[in-house]
Amino acid sequence: ILITRTPYKASPYGKKMNSRLWGSWQNYAREKYIFVIQDVRGRWKSEGEFVNVRPFIANKKKKKDIDEASDVYDTTEWLLQHTKKNNGKVGIIGSSYSGFYSIMGALSAHPAIKAAVPQAPVTDWFLGDDYHHNGAFMLCDGFRFAASMNRPRPVPTEESTPAKPYYQTDEYSFFLKAG
């Protein structure tokens, strides 16, 4: 089983997913890998509350202590029990934000996870990553990203909530005018 977890939408869902299999994924398909592309907690068709780069909890003490690692653990358990013809081995792969989820998969310490492949993962948004560059907040990038990721979503859905348009080529003037 090869898992990719994403905040960006796992659709097309079900058997239509084959349209996503391009490039190196076709090699895995020829080798009979079972693909799972999962919307993360609180995004698109997944229930719960989405938290941007939800922190890892090393010593979970209560059932309410959830993080992306515990979600990967639970997903892996469910897949092993409900997916026919699996060999009991799981890999988790992703790049950028999905790479962060691959790291969390490794931290889940599920014994069936044999490989984690984080490619250019989001790691520390406060130092040297997309939101902050050496501690300086990247307002334009953060604003654009938050406008797409942090919109309210009261129920699981395939529909996108429209963002408030702010069409602007001169972002300095846009923020200056906004106050």
Give residue ranges: language-model regions.
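Accessory cap/linker subdomain of secreted extracellular hydrolases
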Residues: 21-22, 30, 55, 62-65, ...
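Catalytic nucleophile serine of serine hydrolases
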Residues: 46, 96-97, 120
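Loop/turn elements at helix/coil->beta-strand transitions in domains of secreted/extracellular proteins
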Residues: 1, 31-35, 86-90, 111-115
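Cap/lid segment of the alpha/beta-hydrolase catalytic domain
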Residues: 1-81, 131, 137
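Short glycine-enriched nucleophile-adjacent loop
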Residues: 97-110
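Alpha/beta-hydrolase fold nucleophile elbow
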Residues: 83-97
